[in-house]
Amino acid sequence: MAAQRVFPLSCVVQQYAWGKMGSNSEVARLLASSDPLAQISEDRPYAELWMGTHPRGDAKILDNRISQKTLGQWIADNQDSLGSKVKDTFNGKLPFLFKVLSVETALSIQAHPNKELAEKLHLQAPQHYPDANHKPEMAIALTPFQGLCGFRPVEEIVTFLTKVPEFQFLIGDNAAAQLKQSLSQDSEAVTSALRSCFSHLMKSEKKVVVEQLNLLVKRISQQVAAGNNMEDICGELLLQLHQQYPGDIGCFAIYFLNLLTLKPGEAMFLEANVPHAYLKGDCVECMACSDNTVRAGLTPKFIDVPTLCEMLSYTPSPSQDRLFPPARSPEDPYLSIYDPPVPDFTVMKVEVPGSVTEYKVLALDSASILLVVQGTVTASSPTAQAAIPLKRGGVLFIGANESVSLKLTVPKDLLMFRACCLL
C-alpha cells in the first residue's frame, strides 16, 4: 500500500509582544476555528502561525498512523516527497517557511542580507546571525496591511527635509544639500547621497535623537490639538510609532521609506537588502527558511549600524512599484500565482465560489503546504486512507506529485493559500 503523502498539520503559534491580542488576532481566530480544544487568552498576543519545519516551530502531524511526530522528521525520512529538483537543490530540506502574521504594534525596521553576506555575517557573529542563508520574503494582505518598504523617491525625502526641521537637523546640512543636488544628477550620485543621509541619521547620538524627536512630537501634538491636519509630514504615524517606541531612531525612518497600505490580496516582495517594517494588519507571509535580520530601529534589540548602512539597497522608487501583482493561472480560473524572482518559494491563492461543489488541487513537482482561510472542505487523495475534513484555519501538507480533490461541504466561498517551490 502506498505511503501516506497527504496529511493535516497542527502548527506552532508564536506569541511575540507585537502581535494582536486574543480574538482580535487572525492567527488566534484561525487557531480557534481549526482546533476545538484551543483556548484563546484575550490578554495574550497571537503574533505568528508557523507552517513548516523550522526547528523553532516544526509542525506536528495530525495522523496517528504516521510514525513520525513532526513534519521535519517526516521529510527527513521521506525526502522524495519534496520533489526531485527541490530535494537536490535544497539538500533534502523544505526550503520555505509559511506564516500568518497578526501585527498590532510595529515590527523593527530591518533588512535581510543576501546569501554571500549572510555567510560572512554568520561566520563573524553567529550570536546575531544564526544561519548562513538569505531571507527573501513576501507578504500578502488578509486585511488592510500597513508597512514601510524601500526608499522613497528622492523628491519626497527632500520635501520632508524642508518641512521637518528636526529631521534635517539629524541629517546635517551638508548631507541634505548633497541629496538636493543629486536630483539633477545620475543614479550613482543619488545612491551615494541617499547612503550619506541615511548613515548620518543612523549614526546620530542617542541623546540628540531623543531631543529632536521630543521637539517634533510636541509640535505635531500641538498642531493636532488645534485641529490641524499633519498628514503632509505623516503626523499620525509618527505619534503612533513614538508611543510604541519612545525616543527610537526608527521614528525618523518614516521620512526615508515608502508607506504602503496593501488591500486584501495585494502583496509586497522584499528582496535582500531592502529596508522594511510591518506596521499593522494581518497577512500571509512566505520566506526562505532563515532567521537572519539586520535591524535599523523600532526595536530594543541589537542594531548593527555599520553592517546595515553598508548593505542596504539605496534605490529610490515610488510606493506603487513595491507592489507585487500575482499572475492568473491559464489552466485554473480560481488560481492566482505570486511567483517572486527567487527559487525558494512561490505562493498560490485559490478563490473558489460557494456555488462550486468540487475543486481539484493540482499536483506539483514540489512539496506544498495548504492553508484554508475561509470555507469548509473535505480533502481526499489517492494515498490518504480516509477523507480529511478541513475548515477555516486547517493546514494540509501535500507531497510532491500528489493531487488532492476537495469537496466544498458548505456553500460558502473558499479562500486558500498554498506555499510551494517551483524550480
From Swiss-Prot:
Q: Which domain of life is it from?
A: Eukaryota
Which EC numbers does the record give? 5.3.1.8
Modification type N-acetylalanine: residues: 2
Please classify the protein's predominant subcellular localization into one broad category.
cytoplasm
Obligatory cofactor(s): Zn(2+)
Pathway, per Swiss-Prot/TrEMBL? Nucleotide-sugar biosynthesis; GDP-alpha-D-mannose biosynthesis; alpha-D-mannose 1-phosphate from D-fructose 6-phosphate: step 1/2
Alphabetic keyword roster: Acetylation, Cytoplasm, Isomerase, Metal-binding, Phosphoprotein, Zinc
Residue numbers annotated as active site:
295
Q: Which reaction does it catalyse?
A: D-mannose 6-phosphate = D-fructose 6-phosphate
What does the record list as GO biological process?
GDP-D-mannose biosynthetic process from fructose-6-phosphate; GDP-mannose biosynthetic process; mannose to fructose-6-phosphate catabolic process
Which amino acids does the record list as binding Zn(2+)? 110, 112, 137, 276
Q: Name one GO cellular component term.
A: cytosol
Q: How is the cofactor bound?
A: Binds 1 zinc ion per subunit.
Quote the PROSITE patterns the UniProt record gives.
PMI_I_1, PMI_I_2
NCBIfam families cross-referenced by the UniProt entry: manA
PANTHER family membership: MANNOSE-6-PHOSPHATE ISOMERASE
Q: Which family does it belong to?
A: Belongs to the mannose-6-phosphate isomerase type 1 family.
Under what name is this protein listed? Mannose-6-phosphate isomerase
